[in-house]
């Protein structure tokens, strides 16, 4: 699990990287929760998602947004963090220009950043959005959403009411050419305490199904 330092728009970016031997292996970028509320690339769900994607055959990277850990810079309310994510994806794409799939997976604040990255990078073929803060951030930029993906949310989320995520899912599901999958975890809070294994299994099942589909699951 190499500890790497990448060049970023605000200076160095601290990251972890696990590769696959196949040059066209699928790749995945994992985005952590809000930096000002304890979010780092070492949060348990980020860490476990990183390893689960690698188990599924992906070259995978997780990293600290600016101002977190050894990443330089300071919190930038999303704009700078999106630039950080784009810089890391640039690095991945330079090393692996022809992946069979390209995933972006984000948790909470990271889900918002991931969906913005999805709009800007046509090479991203699938997304996983876990506990997206649909009550705090505007997702209207997903017009249209360019790829199919998975939303996972807890019914007892104390930060983001499940009804707000349902509205987002309903809006995206009405768009043509994509398929939105939404899984609610009964009793789970925003941090999925005591439910993280269930989240990982849901993501694994979805990713495996998408990558096995002859049409990419779109």
Regions found by a protein language model. Give the residues of each.
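C-terminal catalytic histidine-bearing segment of alpha/beta-hydrolase fold enzymes
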Residues: 175-218
């Amino acid at each position: 699990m190499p500890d790497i330092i990448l060049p970023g728009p605000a200076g160095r970016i601290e990251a972890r990287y696990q590769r696959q031997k196949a040059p066209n292996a699928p790749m995945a970028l994992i985005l952590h929760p809000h930096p000002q509320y304890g979010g780092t690339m070492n949060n348990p769900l980020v860490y476990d998602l990183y390893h689960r994607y690698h188990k599924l055959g992906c070259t995978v990277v997780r990293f600290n947004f600016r101002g977190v850990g050894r990443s330089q810079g300071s919190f930038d309310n999303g704009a700078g963090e999106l630039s950080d994510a784009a810089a890391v994806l640039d690095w991945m794409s330079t090393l692996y220009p022809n992946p069979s799939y390209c995933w972006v997976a984000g948790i909470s604040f990271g889900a918002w950043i991931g969906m913005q990255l999805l709009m800007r990078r046509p090479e991203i073929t699938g997304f996983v959005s876990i506990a997206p803060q649909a009550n705090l951030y505007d997702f209207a930029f997903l017009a249209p959403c360019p790829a199919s993906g998975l939303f996972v949310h807890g019914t007892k989320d104390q930060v983001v009411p499940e009804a707000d995520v349902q509205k987002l899912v309903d809006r995206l599901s009405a768009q043509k050419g994509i398929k939105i999958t939404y899984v609610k975890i009964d009793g789970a809070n925003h941090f999925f305490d005591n439910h993280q294994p269930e989240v990982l299994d849901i993501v694994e099942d979805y990713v495996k199904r998408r990558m096995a589909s002859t049409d990419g699951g779109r």
